[in-house]
Amino acid sequence: MTTLTSGSPTPMGAHFDGVGINFTLFSAHAEQVELCLFDDNNQELRIPLPARSGDIWHGYLPGGKPGQRYGYRVSGPFNPQQGHRFNPHKLLIDPYARALDRKVGDDPSLQGGVSQPDYRDSAAVAPKCIVVHEEYDWQGDRRPTIPWGNTVIYEAHVRGLTQLHPDIPADLRGTYAGLAHPAMIQYLQKLGITTLELLPVQFHIDEPRLQKMGLSNYWGYNVLAPYAVDPDYASGREGISPLRELRDAVKALHQAGIEVILDVVFNHSAELDVFGPTLCQRGIDNASYYWLTSEGEYDNMTGCGNTLRLSQPYVMQWVLDCLRYWVDSCHIDGFRFDLGTVLGRSPAFDQHAPLFAALAADKQLCNCKMIAEPWDIGLGGYQLGNFPTGFSEWNDQYRDAMRRFWLRGDLPLGQFAQHFAASSNLFKHRERLPSASINQITAHDGFTLQDLLCFNQKHNQINGEENRDGSDNNLSNNFGSEGLVADDAIWQRRKACQRALLTTLLLSQGTPMLLAGDEHGHSQQGNNNAYCQNNILTWLDWGSADRELTAFTAELIRLRQQIPALIQDSWWEDGDGNVQWLDSQGEALSDGAWEQGCQKQLQIRLSQRWLVVINATDQACEMHLPVGEWVVIPPFEPSEHTEPLTVWNGSAHTVCVLTQKF
């Protein structure tokens, strides 16, 4: 007969100590917690956890071994008005689970009940947790620790980046092993990427409505088990677990000097709204894990049906433990927090929230790169510029400003300069540095750079929502022809703007983030919300990549790393030699010029030596350069071209960089 001893209330989760397994589960309102053990024939053995220390239920299984499958059944009141939705008929996963044995299908027995409990048992179809104890030889691996000033982020999806790469073996494409392949790493190095930011690799599931349409959550933001490595991106090679394969990839990237940042989801869970499945937190302690209204309904500040209550001490601890796990177990270098405003809610946003304070005080986490998506859809959800020191933030105002400047022509010059200078109006306070601004023109959600120049309207019909999903405010410009088919004159204008936007991004102060594929000319055929498209629409087509554009981008990144004003990560001040704003005559911009509205011709002198010359008008122009002799440099002119200039003749929608000849 299998029995449990009391064990220990720490550490959280299921841990093998060499002779047995200690199990712990937090629930402040439960009346009983049953540990459910499953054998190879899926026979279930239920054993009540014998001990409770405060709100931690725990027990120890002598002789238990790694690979043991388990789950929980939690009993307590079913009183939705009070926030309680306990239902012991539902098998629940451990919030600390390191692996699960299956994905989740759209099965009605997973429903916990809306106003009354659902009595159908879910064990036959629910995922089971797997006890994981995997040693790993890191072979002296060390984090690259790239200074923020030198950081160039590349946002990518594991499958999308590697699935069609011709030099990666077919059985490794679309996988963590594909990331580690020399062909992939050499490409990132040649491009000049310092930091690879991966879309979620935490264990996620597909929403029932997507399953009904035969689609999947390709991006992976519907996370069920945040401690578990998603097996969807594992090669399945014998003897190599998803965890090991991800570790191998991180180690290989580190050896190449490339950091790895994970996009993590702690704003909501995969249980969705009240009609979603009961898989974990809802059945463990709904009132503790989620923000609820006074009537017990979910306060949906995420648009995903629920919002995790990260101000609750044990829920906060769950997040902190998870981040430490990824750093300790997988040597992750940093995190990008999806809908990051939720991190500071209590329920209003507070930059001094307990979770922020805990992150700053944690010796392991305080040195990681922390990036917030600084908004959610709740009251007061837009918080750009308001995160604490130690965080950088996705800067959508930079994105919109640069799109307006180059594609719409309606941005005042002062706003352009502010955002070019790391959005100093937003970030130059409380000892924050220019690197706090994560500059971007595009990201995974929205048009790709190619589509930004080819489509004025979104084309999301294949997503199954009648083209209602995705933003309608794209600030794009198709230059007179909707779609990828256009005459040569239109394509010349598109290509000029494409290079101008890339140049602006990579030569602005702040931290640049490049969307994977933008350097290829990758198109999603006008789909600006391709979250459910796990197919050639989102996979990078390496065979048709624009190699000239790729080389142009790589040269820009190399140029960026040479300019002190861009990499020293300190604010530009008047007279410090970092920046001069000049007019088309090479003279300092007057107060009147700053105030006259949408000036579209200017010169930006960086670190005295480099000159960024901008013509964002629809017409060719002649611009007089500052006193001295100036030489156009790669990638704007072949390296053998050294004829000095005093006047620059620029085509419409172009930017050029010159260096002073001494």
Swiss-Prot record:
GO biological process, one term: glycogen catabolic process
Pathway this chain belongs to: Glycan degradation; glycogen degradation
Residues under site feature: Transition state stabilizer: 445
CDD domains: AmyAc_Glg_debranch (cd11326), E_set_GDE_Isoamylase_N (cd02856)
GO molecular function list: glycogen debranching enzyme activity; hydrolase activity, hydrolyzing O-glycosyl compounds
Keyword presence, Hydrolase: yes
EC annotation from Swiss-Prot or TrEMBL: 3.2.1.196
Keyword Hydrolase among UniProt keywords: yes
UniProt KW keywords: Carbohydrate metabolism, Glycogen metabolism, Glycosidase, Hydrolase
Catalyzed chemical reaction(s): Hydrolysis of (1->6)-alpha-D-glucosidic linkages to branches with degrees of polymerization of three or four glucose residues in limit dextrin
Active site: 338 (nucleophile), 373 (proton donor)
Family: Belongs to the glycosyl hydrolase 13 family.
Purpose of the protein: Removes maltotriose and maltotetraose chains that are attached by 1,6-alpha-linkage to the limit dextrin main chain, generating a debranched limit dextrin.
The protein's name in its UniProt record: Glycogen debranching enzyme
Source species: Yersinia enterocolitica serotype O:8 / biotype 1B (strain NCTC 13174 / 8081)
Taxonomy of the source species: Bacteria, Pseudomonadati, Pseudomonadota, Gammaproteobacteria, Enterobacterales
